[in-house]
UniProtKB/Swiss-Prot annotation:
Function of the protein: Hydrolyzes trehalose to glucose. Could be involved, in cells returning to low osmolarity conditions, in the utilization of the accumulated cytoplasmic trehalose, which was synthesized in response to high osmolarity.
UniProt organism field: Shigella flexneri serotype 5b (strain 8401)
Protein's UniProt name: Cytoplasmic trehalase
GO molecular function: alpha,alpha-trehalase activity
Assigned EC number: 3.2.1.28
Gene3D superfamilies: 1.50.10.10
Gene: treF
Main location as per UniProt: cytoplasm
Catalytic activity, reaction form: alpha,alpha-trehalose + H2O = alpha-D-glucose + beta-D-glucose
Length: 549
C-alpha cells in the first residue's frame, strides 16, 4: 500500500512520560512516534515497486522546475505525462544539461516524455437531440477501456472499463462515479455498472481503500466514502448481490478508522478524532504533506500567503481535495482566503453521515449472511456515531447540521453538506423538518440549491450549484416525507441544466444558479470542465423520475 498504512501507535507508549510537541493548538497532541511528517511509500500489491512513486517523487528537482516554469497551462499535464525511458536516466540527463546556456526545458520534456493523450471522439453534439438523447449518446464518449500499465506512468491501470468525468479529468474518480452510476443504471447500462463495481472492489483489494482517482498521486488519500451507496445501487439494479461486497466494505471501514483504538480524548490520528467525551468521529486527511502533484504551483503559492508552516498548508489542501469540496468556505479559517485553509481541524457532517451509511450497510449485509455478532457490533457503531453527530454537529438553536471545529470546540459554517444525513437516513423527522426550513430560506434558488450561502470565489460556494448536492437533497427530503421541497429542487435543477443545454448544447461540471439565469459556474483552480459525468448521471436519473424538462 502506498502512503496509506502507518504503524499504529502502541497504547503502552502513550503512557510513557514524553515531551509533547504542541502545533498551534494543545487539543491535537501530536506525538513524534504517532505521526510522521511524510510516510515512506510502500509497495502496492500487484504493481512493480517502482510504480508506487508519484511523478514528484520520481523526478525531484526536474518536476519542480517544470511546474515552476509553467511550460503547461495546467499543472496536471506534467504529472500525467509518461516517460519515454527509465525515469532515473531522464533525471541524470537533466542534471547534466540543465545548466547549459542553450538548455530548453520544454524541448527537454517533449524529447523525454509522452504528453497525455487527448482522447479523440467522433461525437458531435446534435442540437436537435433531447437532453435524454444527448446523455445516452455521451456514455461511450466518456468510457475508457482497460489498458496495460504503461511503465512509470502515473495512471493506474484498471481491469475493467470505466467512465471518466470529462475535460481535464482522464481517469476515474471515486465519489463522482457513484452519481455517474445513477444515470448509467437509468440508461440500462448494466454492463458498465458491472465493470465499475469490479474496478472499485479491485482497488480496495489492492490498495486497502478506494483512492481519490486511479493515479499514483491520488493514492495517499480517498474521497467521500460512497462505496456502500454503490453496493446498494448494485443490489437495487440487480447488477451484483450486496453480500459479495461485505469484505470490501469492512476493508474500507478499517482504512477510515485506522488508529482509533489507541487514541485518548482530544487526540487525532489520520482520519479519526477522539472527542472529549470519548466518542469517535472522522475528518478528511491525506498521508502526504507536500504540494499536490496535479496542482503543485498553486499549492506552493497558497502556502506562501498562509503564515503557517507550508507542510501544514499542503496537508490541509490535500485533505480538502479528499473531501471532494475543493475548495469551499467550509475549510477556511477566514472565508474568502484559501491560504487560511484548515481542513483537518474540521469534523465534516457529510463524511460522518457517509460513514454512518457504511456502518449500517455492514450491519445489514452481515444480518443477511447470518453473522449476528458483526451485525450487532456495527449497529452499535452506527448508533454511537449518530449520537456523537447529534451532540457535536447538530445546531439545535438554528435547526441545522454544521461541521464542527474540533480544535476550537465550536460549530462551523452551514452548507448543503447538511443534507447528507437525510440522504443516508441518519436524521430524525424533527431534524429533517427543521433542516428543510433552513434550506428553503438560505440555500434554495430558482435554479436549485446552492453549495453554501457564502460568496468566496471558491467553486463549492455561492453562486454555484452541483449535481450531487441536488440529488441528495431531492432524495433526502422525499425520504422524510417532504415531497414538495424535493420535487421543487428536482424541477428547478432540470430546468437549469436543460436551459443551459438548449443554449450551449453541452453538460458542465457546475452551474451558476444564484439569480435564476443558468450560467457557467466559476471559481476553482482550473477552467470549467465539459462532459460531465456526475451531471449526466443525476440528470438522467431525474429524467427517469420526472420526465424531460
Amino acid at each position: 500500500m502506498l502512503n496509506q498504512k502507518i504503524q499504529n501507535p502502541n497504547p503502552d507508549e502513550l503512557m510513557i512520560e514524553v515531551d509533547l510537541c504542541y502545533e498551534l493548538d494543545p487539543y491535537e497532541l501530536k506525538l513524534d512516534e504517532m505521526i510522521e511528517a511524510e510516510p515512506e511509500p510502500e509497495m502496492i500489491e500487484g504493481l512493480p515497486a517502482s510504480d508506487a512513486l508519484t511523478p514528484a517523487d520520481r523526478y525531484l528537482e526536474l518536476f519542480e522546475h517544470v511546474q515552476s516554469a509553467k511550460i503547461f497551462p495546467d499543472s496536471k499535464t506534467f504529472p500525467d505525462c509518461a516517460p519515454k525511458m527509465d525515469p532515473l536516466d531522464i533525471l541524470i540527463r537533466y542534471r547534466k544539461v540543465r545548466r547549459h546556456r542553450d538548455f530548453d526545458l520544454r524541448k527537454f520534456v517533449e524529447n523525454h516524455f509522452w504528453l497525455p493523450e487527448v482522447y479523440s471522439s467522433e461525437y458531435v453534439s446534435d442540437p436537435q437531440n433531447s437532453l435524454k438523447e444527448h446523455i445516452d449518446q455521451l456514455w461511450p464518449v466518456l468510457t475508457r477501456e482497460p489498458q496495460d500499465h504503461i511503465p512509470w506512468s502515473s495512471l493506474l491501470a484498471l481491469p475493467q472499463s470505466y467512465i471518466v468525468p470529462g475535460g481535464r479529468f482522464s481517469e476515474t474518480y471515486y465519489w463522482d462515479s457513484y452519481f455517474t452510476m445513477l444515470g448509467l443504471a437509468e440508461s440500462g447500462r448494466e454492463d458498465l455498472l458491472k465493470c465499475m463495481a469490479d474496478n472499485f472492489a479491485w482497488m480496495i483489494e489492492n490498495y486497502g481503500h478506494i483512492p481519490n482517482g486511479n493515479r499514483t498521486y491520488y493514492l495517499s488519500r480517498s474521497q467521500p466514502p460512497v462505496f456502500a451507496l454503490m453496493v446498494e445501487l448494485f443490489e437495487e439494479d440487480g447488477v451484483r448481490g450486496a453480500r459479495r461486497y461485505l469484505d470490501h466494505l469492512k476493508m474500507e471501514y478499517a482504512f477510515w478508522m485506522d488508529g482509533a483504538e489507541s487514541l485518548i480524548p482530544n487526540q487525532a490520528y489520520r482520519h479519526v478524532v477522539r472527542m472529549p467525551d470519548g466518542s469517535l468521529l472522522n475528518r478528511y486527511w491525506d498521508d502526504r504533506d507536500t504540494p499536490r502533484d496535479e496542482s503543485w504551483l498553486e499549492d506552493v503559492e497558497t502556502a506562501k500567503h498562509s503564515g503557517c508552516p507550508p507542510n501544514e498548508v499542503y496537508r490541509d489542501l490535500r485533505a480538502g481535495a479528499a473531501s471532494g469540496w475543493d475548495y469551499s468556505s467550509r475549510w477556511l479559517r477566514d472565508t474568502g482566503r484559501l491560504a487560511s485553509i484548515r481542513t483537518t481541524q474540521f469534523i465534516p457532517i457529510d463524511l460522518n453521515a457517509f460513514l454512518f451509511k457504511l456502518e449500517s450497510a455492514i450491519a445489514n449485509i452481515s444480518a443477511l449472511k447470518g453473522e449476528k455478532e458483526t451485525e450487532a457490533l456495527f449497529r452499535q457503531k452506527a448508533s454511537a456515531r449518530r449520537d456523537a453527530v447529534n451532540r457535536y454537529l447538530w445546531d439545535d438553536e438554528n435547526g441545522i447540521y454544521r461541521d464542527y471545529d474540533w480544535r476550537r470546540e465550536q460549530l462551523a459554517l452551514f452548507s448543503a453538506a447538511a443534507i447528507v444525513p437525510l440522504y443516508v437516513g441518519m436524521a430524525n423527522h424533527e431534524q429533517a423538518d427543521r433542516l428543510a426550513n433552513a434550506v428553503r430560506s438560505r440555500l434554495l434558488t430558482p435554479g436549485g440549491i446552492l453549495a453554501s450561502e457564502y460568496e468566496t470565489g471558491e467553486q463549492w460556494d455561492k453562486p454555484n450549484g452541483w449535481a450531487p448536492l441536488q440529488w441528495m437533497a431531492i432524495q433526502g427530503f422525499k425520504m422524510y416525507g417532504d415531497d414538495l421541497l424535493g420535487d421543487e429542487i428536482a424541477r428547478s435543477w432540470l430546468k437549469t441544466v436543460n436551459q443551459f443545454y438548449l443554449e450551449q448544447h453541452k453538460m458542465i461540471e457546475k452551474y451558476h444558479i444564484a439569480d435564476g439565469v443558468p450560467r457557467e459556474g466559476g471559481g476553482g483552480e482550473y477552467p470549467l470542465q465539459d462532459g460531465f459525468g456526475w451531471t449526466n448521471g443525476v440528470v438522467r436519473r431525474l429524467i427517469g423520475l420526472y420526465g424531460e424538462p
